[in-house]
């Protein structure tokens, strides 16, 4: 049954298992006086026919626990996203980007980025934009790294010239077989622009009457995976540079608080040392700001009571997805607060909804780690495409 998804009776077992103890699998409660922000890469979220009725209902059951949900891998076809929003309930609204990552009419893998939000708690305000590096920034990078870029591009440029020559011969009837265009596989020495432009939207999370709301710019990003680790680091560092630069402008920014939610593809050649390197890099921003502003990536720290950081992919070996806070508002938690997360039901907390172990315990009577490698592979094939190969992660904030 690999790749066939779950049967109706299996979905019933999954629902019963989840409803018996949602907290066991990291699904947050809806708690009055708090707001839950989340990010979920829902694999190839396109047409309604791509998933069964039971799968859609499961996704909606999970997603309605979140007051603001950043969704990645939305396809050009929006019927699936609309169905998810409809199943979540009439109190939910959405905003979605146009397709990014591929030029219109050209081959490639493009996608949309979107937010679904609970209007009773979260209000969208005036700003909705993508994040990009302006032309002068790109030209300056090309100028500074011209020799390195030329050297990196040379092998591909040669293949492309040969392809064009053979294509002309094919069009002229000299060559009987149409040549195949070479894949663009170049290790760029510097960042030029985002493969998929992140989406930035302004929101308010409304608190109790007479209090000031959380005001923030939510950034939804699905950063480059690609063929080279250096490419991933370049995109991540470029996005951090943009957010930090905007945060420094303070009053010029629409809201001087930014929340990054997305699939940052932060996998690591050497997980422990690389994770420590990134954490040190991010926390180094805090002394620069003093008490005026802070940077906090809670998912880089083990949650209190856990020995290791959360994994966010279905194979349970990477933390691709992240939620990052860049803020001046004193209501947000600093990295020093991470050690005390989860002590109050409506206080600061964070987690991952571990549907992988939910599925395995419901249908195999054991967690995923207890399966043989072959059994893991076969079981993953049943839901990595039908549900997703990423799990949703979330952050709870107490409302003012």
Predicted regions mapped to residue ranges:
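Long, contiguous juxta-domain segments that are non-catalytic but functionally important
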Residues: 1-28, 36, 167, 171-185
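Metal-dependent phosphoester-hydrolase catalytic domains
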Residues: 1-24, 77-78, 120, 137-140, ...
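Beta-strand-turn-beta hairpins that frame and shape the catalytic cleft
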Residues: 26-37, 120-123, 138-155, 189-221, ...
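Active-site surface patch of divalent metal-dependent phosphodiester/phosphate bond hydrolases
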Residues: 32, 36, 48-183
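Residue-level marker for buried hydrophobic side chains located in beta-strands
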Residues: 37-38, 260
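Catalytic metal-binding/acid-base residues of hydrolase active sites
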Residues: 43, 75, 222-224, 264-267
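Extracytoplasmic/secreted cell-surface and envelope-processing proteins
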Residues: 47, 77-82, 103-106, 125, ...
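A long, amphipathic alpha-helix that forms part
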Residues: 229-253
């Amino acid at each position: 049954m690999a790749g066939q998804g779950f049967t109706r009776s299996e979905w019933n077992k999954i629902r019963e298992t989840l409803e018996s103890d949602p907290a066991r699998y990291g699904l947050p409660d809806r708690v009055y006086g708090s707001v839950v922000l989340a990010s979920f890469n829902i694999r190839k979220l396109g047409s309604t026919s791509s998933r069964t009725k039971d799968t859609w209902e499961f996704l909606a059951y999970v997603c309605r626990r979140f007051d603001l949900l950043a969704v990645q891998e939305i396809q050009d076809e929006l019927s699936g996203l609309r169905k998810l929003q409809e199943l979540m309930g009439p109190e939910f609204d959405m905003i979605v980007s146009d397709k990014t990552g591929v030029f219109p009419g050209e081959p490639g893998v493009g996608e949309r980025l979107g937010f679904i939000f609970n209007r009773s708690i979260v209000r969208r305000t005036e700003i909705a934009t993508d994040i990009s590096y302006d032309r002068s920034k790109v030209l300056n990078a090309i100028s500074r790294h011209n020799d390195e870029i030329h050297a990196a591009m040379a092998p591909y440029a040669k293949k492309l010239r040969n392809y064009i020559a053979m294509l002309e011969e094919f069009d002229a009837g000299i060559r009987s077989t149409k040549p195949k265009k070479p894949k663009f596989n170049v290790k760029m020495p510097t960042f030029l622009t985002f493969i998929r432009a992140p989406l930035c939207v302004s929101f308010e999370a409304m608190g109790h009457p007479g209090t000031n709301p959380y005001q923030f710019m939510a950034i939804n990003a699905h950063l480059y995976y690609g063929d080279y680790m250096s490419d991933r680091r370049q995109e991540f560092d470029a996005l951090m540079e943009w957010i930090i630069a905007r945060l420094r402008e303070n009053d010029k920014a629409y809201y001087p608080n930014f929340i990054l939610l997305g699939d940052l593809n932060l996998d690591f050649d050497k997980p422990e040392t690389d994770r420590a390197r990134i954490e040190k890099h991010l926390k180094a921003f805090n002394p620069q700001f003093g008490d005026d502003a802070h940077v906090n990536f809670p998912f880089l720290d083990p949650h209190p009571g856990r020995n290791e950081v959360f994994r966010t992919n279905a194979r349970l070996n990477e933390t691709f997805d992240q939620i990052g806070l860049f803020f001046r508002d004193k209501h947000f938690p600093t990295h020093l607060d991470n050690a005390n997360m989860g002590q109050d039901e409506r206080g600061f907390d964070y987690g991952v909804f571990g549907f992988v172990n939910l599925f395995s315990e419901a249908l195999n009577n054991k967690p995923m780690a207890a399966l043989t490698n072959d059994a893991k592979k076969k079981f993953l094939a049943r839901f990595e495409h039908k549900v997703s190969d990423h799990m949703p992660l979330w952050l709870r904030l107490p409302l003012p």
